[in-house]
């Protein structure tokens, strides 16, 4: 028996919700923008194979790979429930660039833990599994946060709550929005992007941030796409992180002139997202970004929609 799980790319923060909002996205042309993990019966407790277009960026020692840590914490949780871990062989297909702002580590974590859970007939419930995913993400970025793993696992636009045992809940969004994702092909480390942020904020920035986030969530729930798009503004991170992203200011300016509703940094960058109301605008923005924002052959641009499914079982073979 084998199980393969695909976990999609995600946009952390979505500009307006620093560390509390995240959205899963999938290209409209059917390209798999995300990682896949296969788990099948093995002869030893754990063995790892790696594949995929970004396999060269992974550590050569399997024990340094985050999916090995996923296996360890999954084993810990099974032990607490008095359940036995099956000997298994895992294959990670790494299709996501590392340090891209597309939730690359979240893709590997979500695909690995979901596949492990499926392979063992789902002993952990959704929130237990999500808590483990946040723990693993924290191991990479230095603090537990869910704004990539929650949408990657659950799909859609997710708001982090962390109250009453609820880690996150889905916010209704606009299915007709196109999300143009542009990765320039350079790397920005999450730790560096966090270090650049101020330790304190001015009162007017805190008030503006609260107004934007509350306004955005209100507009999503009341079905006002124009208002929602206007509220996608970031006073917390983007003003400081722009300097890490060559060409971002020009890209945002062009996207607005071409008719995009909003443009922002995906996670800590360097990927940007641009929301467009119709496909013509999305294609125009995508073409410009391909010619002006992408810096090398590793970069790419995809026109996406919100991915409402999150991680899914795609079968038993890679």
UniProtKB/Swiss-Prot annotation:
GO cellular component entries: cytoplasm
Superkingdom assignment: Bacteria
Upper taxonomic lineage: Bacteria, Pseudomonadati, Pseudomonadota, Gammaproteobacteria, Vibrionales
GO molecular function terms noted in the UniProt entry: ATP binding; homoserine kinase activity
Catalytic EC class: transferase
Pfam families xrefs: GHMP_kinases_C, GHMP_kinases_N
Compartment annotation: Cytoplasm
NCBIfam families per UniProt: PRK01212.1-4, thrB
Catalytic activity reported: L-homoserine + ATP = O-phospho-L-homoserine + ADP + H(+)
Residues the entry annotates as binding ATP: 97-107
Pathway assigned to this chain's UniProt record: Amino-acid biosynthesis; L-threonine biosynthesis; L-threonine from L-aspartate: step 4/5
EC number: 2.7.1.39
Gene this chain is encoded by: thrB
GO biological process, one term: threonine biosynthetic process
Protein family (similarity comment): Belongs to the GHMP kinase family. Homoserine kinase subfamily.
InterPro entries: GHMP_kinase_C_dom, GHMP_kinase_C_sf, GHMP_kinase_N_dom, GHMP_knse_ATP-bd_CS, Homoserine_kinase, Ribosomal_Su5_D2-typ_SF, Ribsml_uS5_D2-typ_fold_subgr
Keyword field: Amino-acid biosynthesis, ATP-binding, Cytoplasm, Kinase, Nucleotide-binding, Threonine biosynthesis, Transferase
Function, as annotated: Catalyzes the ATP-dependent phosphorylation of L-homoserine to L-homoserine phosphate.
Protein name: Homoserine kinase
